[in-house]
Swiss-Prot record:
It holds the Pfam family Transgly. It is found in: Cell inner membrane. SUPFAM superfamilies: Lysozyme-like. Belongs to the glycosyltransferase 51 family. Peptidoglycan polymerase that catalyzes glycan chain elongation from lipid-linked precursors. GO terms for molecular function: pentosyltransferase activity; peptidoglycan glycosyltransferase activity. Keywords: Cell inner membrane, Cell membrane, Cell shape, Cell wall biogenesis/degradation, Glycosyltransferase, Membrane, Peptidoglycan synthesis, Transferase, Transmembrane, Transmembrane helix. It is an enzyme of class 2 (transferase). One of its GO terms (biological process) is peptidoglycan biosynthetic process. The keyword Membrane applies. This is Biosynthetic peptidoglycan transglycosylase. NCBIfam families: mono_pep_trsgly (TIGR02070).
Length: 244
């Protein structure tokens, strides 16, 4: 009887391993295909947009989704430089993860345990989060974020990652993407954004629901000045240089 129980447990463990392995394979194949499709097809809606719409419905403050997709060549080079300066100085150099920035952020957070935490998410990581995942702060979500970051860096070009980032990122209540933001705040298309306007929009990205580029607080105004000072020194993507 005892031997039969042990044998039965081993059989169950074997079946569980097979099921788990099968699920992992299906998950990889499915997500690989989705990321590959988005290399060529622009997403209509993202998980974050769905969450924001649901939040608006339940709070009776529905603002809808304001979004207009624009190819990277119809977005001002100033905006590309502004987000690289603001969010990810080594965007063109890393493979999705800026280990130097991660170490620096970890050291800073250790020294300022009671202050505001500094993040080190790259533009690639933010794109993975914005396009594929629902917003949360769990380690599980971080794990999926790293996984999708690996996939988009593997399958997409840096140009496509930047294009997706600038078209899907949240830039205000109900505002997604740089074209909608440019029209909302400055009443101009994204391709006509000046350095100052681009830096002002980039400065609100850490807290787009609480900040406004037209009414910057002291911290945001300081950030705008810092971004402007960095824009001329960041490495310019080749697609920007070709478009000039």
């Amino acid at each position: 009887m005892y031997i039969e129980i042990i044998f039965s447990c081993k059989q169950l463990m074997k079946k569980a391993k097979i099921i788990l392995l099968t699920c992992c394979i299906y998950f990889f194949v499915y997500t690989f295909q989705i990321v590959l499709v988005f290399k060529f097809v622009n997403p209509v809606v993202t998980p974050l947009m769905i969450v924001r719409v649901a939040e608006g419905v339940f709070s009776k403050e529905y603002v809808g989704i304001r979004k207009t997709w624009k190819p990277i060549k119809e977005i001002s080079p100033n905006m590309v430089c502004a987000v690289i300066a603001s969010e990810d100085h080594h965007f063109l150099e890393h493979n999705g993860f800026d280990w130097e920035a991660i170490r620096a952020a970890r050291a800073y957070n250790e020294r300022h345990k009671n202050g505001i935490k500094r993040g080190a998410s790259t533009i690639s990581q933010q794109t993975a989060k914005n396009v594929f995942l629902f917003p949360s702060r769990s380690w599980i979500r971080k794990g999926f974020e790293a996984y999708f970051t690996f996939l988009i860096e593997l399958l997409w070009s840096k140009e496509r990652i930047m294009e997706m980032y600038l078209n899907e990122i949240e830039m205000g209540k109900g505002i997604y993407g740089i074209e909608a933001a440019a029209q909302k705040y400055y009443h101009i298309p994204a391709k006509k954004l000046s350095q100052q306007q681009a830096a002002s929009i980039a400065a609100i990205l850490p807290l787009p629901l609480k900040r406004n580029p037209l009414k910057p607080g002291k911290n945001t105004a300081s950030r705008v000045l810092w971004i402007r000072s960095q824009m001329s020194s960041v490495e310019k993507p080749t697609w920007i240089l070709k478009s000039k």
